[in-house]
Amino acid sequence: MFPQIFGKYVLERELASGGMARVYLATLRGAVGFEKRLVVKQIRPELSVDEAFVKRFVEEAKIAVELSHPNIVPVYELGVELGIYYIAMELCEGLTLTEILTDTGPLDPAEGAQVGIEICRALDYAHRRRNIVHRDVTPRNVLLDEEGAVRLIDFGIAAPVTSALSTERVEVFGSPGHMPPEQIRGERLTPATDVFAVGALLIEAWTGRPPFRRNSFEASADALNEPLPSLAEEDEELEPIAGIIAQAVALKAAERPQEAEALARKLREFSRQFDSGDVAKRRPHLRVRGFEP
């Protein structure tokens, strides 16, 4: 089945598959032996004939192509080949936060703080410079590359920050258990929407357990009203940051930090008590696994 020719790309193997898209390791081949490895994400053929879906995919891909930040995996191209729409993006060898938590368990306080700080850097750029919210900040969309950098991936469902005067309903996209109430209800999206997702992600990173994710959309929404896990009971070193994280996942958007940078400042203050060093350097074995078979 592989390799497959797909326009100017050679698809080497499938990396992931979901309800909307398939993701492939690919090679771009040019003159005199030039080769570049990257990732190609194709929307499923049955969705390529859905005009509304294609329009949204193209609009979102145009947003992603414009993003340029050290903590965001860049998208190189939006295209269509044989009637199939796709985006090509940088190949970052490393592990997702989901893989790290599965393989080695929860992060320690310093590691989690560093991950949170770098995610917030990416989001602050998206919010301030591009006026968009990510809408899907989850452990599977956070990548730790082999150089130790934290990279935010998949701005595929990013959306413009919603005006405070807007009464238009926003389409509900995102991952159950990582969306705040206003996102679930299709209401106004602001930077505080992503701040909630970062707070939920950090709780999971430090405890190994997602605070709100359950087996269904409805159960995940109901879990928002359940008591939060106690970070201080998980690790007493987390006590100084526990209150800030509780604010980040407040059900009312107005009660959260209103900017990603505001949360990052608190995380930087918290992290000053620890030795410096990124997660990959603190856990060298994480650097040996990437997209290679």
Predicted features along the sequence, with ranges:
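Activation segment signature within eukaryotic-like protein kinase domains
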Residues: 115-116
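Activation-segment/catalytic-loop signature of the eukaryotic protein kinase fold
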Residues: 78
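Conserved N-lobe ATP-binding subsite of Hanks-type protein kinase domains
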Residues: 22
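C-terminal lobe helix-coil module of Hanks-type protein kinase domains
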Residues: 177-278
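AlphaC helix of the eukaryotic protein kinase fold
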Residues: 42-66
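Conserved short submotifs of the Hanks-type protein kinase catalytic core
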Residues: 82-96, 100
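Protein kinase catalytic-loop region centered on the HRD/HxD motif
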Residues: 121-132
